């Protein structure tokens, strides 16, 4: 059965990033490689961990980053909810419930 009209179902070659873009120079991995070299050893897979020290991954996450991540939007939603509650309560204030 032939696939027609652009129904390829995602069966195409995956694009992989070039391994040479990841460098260990200037990262803690460089120190590890030097310590291993002093013992006559080498980590051939060290470059595979270099991405952890580049770009957005380079910044370590602090407790306050985790705790306050959605705080401003959560607080805004809280203020809107409280405002709506007071507004609806003021509409029903004239009606007395027995």
Curated annotation (Swiss-Prot):
Taxonomic superkingdom: Eukaryota
N6-acetyllysine modified-residue sites: 23, 34
GO cellular component: a single term: mitochondrion
Subcellular location: Mitochondrion inner membrane
Modification sites for N6-succinyllysine: 23, 34
Membrane topology annotation: Single-pass membrane protein
UniProt GO MF annotations: NADH dehydrogenase (ubiquinone) activity
Modified residues (Pros-methylhistidine): 5, 7, 9
Alphabetized PANTHER family for the sequence: NADH DEHYDROGENASE [UBIQUINONE] 1 BETA SUBCOMPLEX SUBUNIT 3, NADH-UBIQUINONE OXIDOREDUCTASE B12 SUBUNIT
Disease per record: Mitochondrial complex I deficiency, nuclear type 25: A form of mitochondrial complex I deficiency, the most common biochemical signature of mitochondrial disorders, a group of highly heterogeneous conditions characterized by defective oxidative phosphorylation, which collectively affects 1 in 5-10000 live births. Clinical disorders have variable severity, ranging from lethal neonatal disease to adult-onset neurodegenerative disorders.
Stated name of the protein: NADH dehydrogenase [ubiquinone] 1 beta subcomplex subunit 3
Source species taxonomy: Eukaryota, Metazoa, Chordata, Craniata, Vertebrata
């Amino acid at each position: 059965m032939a696939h027609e009209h652009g129904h390829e179902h995602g069966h195409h070659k995956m694009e992989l990033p070039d391994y040479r873009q990841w460098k260990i120079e200037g990262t803690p991995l460089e120190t590890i490689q030097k310590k291993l070299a002093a013992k006559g050893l080498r980590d051939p897979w060290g470059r595979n961990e270099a991405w952890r020290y580049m770009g957005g991954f380079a910044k370590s996450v602090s407790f306050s980053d985790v705790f306050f991540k959605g705080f401003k939007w959560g607080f805004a939603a809280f203020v809107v909810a409280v405002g709506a509650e007071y507004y609806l309560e003021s509409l029903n204030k004239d009606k007395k419930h027995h």
